[in-house]
Design a protein with these regions (language model features):
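PLP-dependent aminotransferase-class I/II
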Residues: 73-119
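Conserved PLP-binding catalytic core of the aspartate aminotransferase-like
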Residues: 249-253, 262-299
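Active-site phosphate-binding strand-loop segment of PLP-dependent enzymes
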Residues: 101-154, 158
Length: 343
């Protein structure tokens, strides 16, 4: 991946950006195809943008919501997404969940039958704690009710199965696929192409007759990063995604099992969840920013100090996030436990 990114950057420097991009048409098509496979979408529905944030903004700008638009969310929804909905005037409809925060499928069926929102939006893998939503089942409920499902797969792509049957999936390159920064992806199912094309024809009447993915893609772009994301996606496919997902789930469970008996810390979220992400709530007044700084500065252990803005409808105070990847060992986890228990 690094070689592909640097090779394209060198091509831009020696031949010019436009010529280099033309010469990279095959690599970009391959990237689109690999991502389409991971997301369960048609190649022509895959758009490249700068980030998951830009992807959501693009989606909200072009989706044909109609009058009095609303969007269904769960309490664990990512805070910046909620802000994006608010800026665009979408009324928030809170969807039912169980005690652990998973969508209550029967409750969702009732909501969609009685007072359906314009769309349902689900963050598939929560950023702030262990919580992987049953998105394939949610997609089935939404499809039966003819309500589009939007999926934020920023923490899901490369982490869990993202080919779920949703109307729209968007993600970023730089998380579990470990692709380049500055690249995101927005993918739309073909059933929704006609409605989007009608909106795009109004917004850009002079736009060329192109596939939906091309129309939604950012024009001024980090082409080398897109090529790098394609390489990362193909590497993931070559490893066998189910094996990667199973390994990440095992690492996450091992992390929570090891840390759940720590004094002065409480594991947030189900221990048996399939997420590799874990969160710890301080119970003795610890400053999570100071703990993060100590772990990194003294031991080289990377964690994240999380504040309430990440999930303002659910979080009640700061937490410490641990996000081990597939190469994390049991010794690494013991070292983290000992470091957290030492002060």
């Amino acid at each position: 991946m690094l070689a592909a990114v640097s090779d394209h950057a060198l091509s831009e420097a020696t031949m010019g950006a436009y010529v280099a991009q033309e010469m990279a048409t095959g690599a970009l098509s391959a990237a689109q195809g690999a991502l389409a496979q991971l997301l369960g979408m048609p190649d022509e529905g895959v758009a490249f943008v700068e980030s998951a944030t830009v992807a959501l903004g693009t989606l909200l700008d072009v989706w044909p919501f109609g009058a009095e638009p609303s969007i269904g969310v769960v309490p664990s929804e990512w805070g910046p997404n909620l802000a994006a909905f608010s800026r665009r005037g979408l009324r928030i409809v809170e969807l039912p969940v169980d005690d652990d925060g998973y969508v209550d499928l029967a409750g969702l069926e009732r909501v969609l039958a009685s007072s359906p929102p314009s769309a349902v939006h689900i963050t598939q893998v929560a950023s702030h704690r262990s919580l992987v939503q049953p998105v394939a089942a949610i997609a089935g409920v939404c499809h039966a009710a003819a309500v589009p499902l939007f999926v934020d797969a920023a923490q899901a792509l490369g982490h869990v199965d993202t080919a779920t049957g949703a109307a729209v999936v968007y993600a970023t390159s730089r998380k579990w696929l470990t692709g380049p920064r500055g690249v995101g992806v927005l993918a739309v199912a073909s059933a929704w192409f006609p409605g989007l094309r009608r909106v795009l024809e109004v917004l850009e009447p002079e736009a060329p007759e192109e596939p939906i993915g091309a129309l939604l893609s950012s024009r001024e772009s980090h082409v080398a990063g897109r090529i790098g994301l394609g390489h990362a996606a193909r590497e993931h496919l070559s490893l066998g995604p189910p094996a990667v997902w199973q390994r990440l789930a095992a690492v996450g469970r091992a992390t929570r099992q090891l840390l759940q008996d720590l004094d002065n810390w409480q594991v947030v979220g189900p221990v048996d969840d399939a997420s590799a992400i874990s969160a710890l709530r301080p119970t003795a007044g610890q400053d999570v920013m100071a703990v993060r700084a100590r772990l990194l500065g003294e031991l080289g252990i990377v964690t994240t100090a999380q504040h309430v803005f990440r999930a303002p409808r659910e979080m009640r105070g700061p937490t410490l996030r641990v996000s081990p990847h597939v190469d994390t060992t049991s010794d690494d986890l013991v070292r983290l436990r000992d470091a957290l228990g030492s002060r």
